[in-house]
Amino acid sequence: MPIVAQIEQALFQLAPKDLAFDWDNVGHLEGSPDQEVQRVLVALDVTENVVSEAEKLGCQLIVSHHPLMNVRWHQAEMQTLRPNRYLGRLLRRLVKADI
């Protein structure tokens, strides 16, 4: 069974890190790199609907084109990850679901 770190390395072979913008937060952002993965959900953006779908399907990993924690887009919101704010609420759900 592949682990998150192996999937990340395979993705970097297809899309090398150095092709990303310097402000783009690429790579594994949350959870254990050693987690085994049976199911992956691929999405353009990590939204509440995407997280719900990943939970419903029993996914251990979401691979998205746009990073959930993008410093350029979410700089102010990342300073406090509160569950009453959008980004904090999504991250809390992902951590609880071990995705």
Show the residue positions of the predicted features.
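Active-site catalytic microenvironments in core metabolic enzymes, especially phosphate/sugar-handling
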Residues: 1-99
